[in-house]
Structure formats: C-alpha cells, structure tokens
C-alpha cells in the first residue's frame, strides 16, 4: 500500500510452510540394511512467519531528501517428527540430540548446550537451572545447579530487523545501514571458561575473576544471556563534487565506517555469532566465532 504520493509505503506478508522428506542420518541394523547408517528423507518441520515493511520519505525537496526504510521478520519453526516408514521399515531417531557445544582453550571437556528436540524450534537451550553459589574447601565458589534440565530459550532469533536511512543535502549524502535480531539467547562460554580461576596458570582469566573467585565450570543457565542486539552496519558520507570539465562528467568521493557500533545488553565478546546454521557453534560464544571488526574506507568515483 502506498500513501501521500508514494511517500509512505507499507508491505505485509504472511507465510506458512510444512516441510516433509527432510534428510536425516539414521542408525539401522545390519541386516537388512548393508550399512549401519542410512540417509533417509523422513523428517517433518513446520514454519510460519510474518514480514512487515515500512518506507517513508518525510522530506522530498530539490536540495534535500530523506528516505527511511525498515523491514521486520517474525518467524517460528517447529521440528514435528524425525520418524517414519522407509521401504517397510519404521525408522526412529532420538527426540533429543545435542547440536552445539563448548569447545576450545580454557574449557576442559566439550558439553552440549544447544539441542535438537522434537516438538520444539530447532536449536533450544536445554540446561540445568543455576541455584546459587556454595563455598568449596579452598574458599572458592562453586555452582549449585538443579538435577533436572529445562528448556530455557532458543538460539535462533524470533524477530529480525533491517533498516536503511538515506539523507541528501545538495551535493552531500549520508547513508546509514542497521540490522538487529531479537528473542534469542547466547551461551557465554567465554566467560564460563575465563571467569574460572582453575584455568590458571595454563590460561589467563578475565578481569573480575579473582574477585568472584569461581572455581568451577559446570554448565547451567547462569551464563545464558539475551542475544538481542541492534548493529549499525555502516555509515557512508559522500560528496558529489561540482565540476566543469569536457573530460570528466561526474566526480564523487566518499568515506565509510563499517561495524560502527552494537547496541546490546550481552556481556560477552559479541552477540553477532552463529544463530542460523545448525552446527557445533549454534548459539555459542566460545571464541570459535571471529568477532565482526570495524573498518574504514575511502572511495572515489570518476565518470568520463
């Protein structure tokens, strides 16, 4: 829909899908199968979501123009089943299986934190609940956790946002690009490892670790944090230089800053980690994901 001579544009889309015949590796008996592993199309998943777009041009004049565009996506998915019939044989898969885990220097022994669970979204955190600290024989702190695990969040965002703001004044223009993700969690494995005083002397510890004096690395929801963020992807400032030349038609110079800032409550390295790919790093911040770096660039465009 468009209003005000196309200066306000609204778009909305709803989608729902049911995916069947998903590939999965099954453990099977030999015989009747020639191998102990079988790749079969039996899994089912359901997805539905809503996409909303908004664009407005509040200023449109000869020497000045401002355009603001934003889109939001809200998505839900559910793993319905992995079981099914294959050539007369009913194949089953575990209802609960680990997807991602903590790994790397400073953490001794990998352990699953994010799981594939039938009846839930792909990539849920299934962890013991943190009950408090207790003092050990050395005067350090240990985690007290519940015996039972519970679903305490998901690694995939429930909502995603993208925005572009473009402003022009005579020969000058400024463009700002932003994106965000909301409704998901990040497991701060970096803090779990480096807030642990038992990491010394083999590894360094983080600032504040001696004061807290944690001497434990048991996994619980203590280091599970909100992954919500808004990231300013880049800001570009350009100048179309007025030029009178029989050889040069247009001359433009610009400068850009990429990864300007991230607005988030997350206390770890960065919330911008793997939140979509179903592999061992899903939803986990444990140094395997290289943080997005800031860069600066200068450009020149000449048209002859």
Descriptions of predicted regions:
Residues 1-33, 73:
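Membrane-embedded beta-barrel scaffold of Gram-negative outer-membrane proteins
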Residues 1-4, 9, 98-175, 213-227, ...:
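Outer-membrane beta-barrel transmembrane strand signature
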Residues 8-10, 66-68, 72, 163, ...:
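Transmembrane beta-strands of outer-membrane beta-barrel proteins
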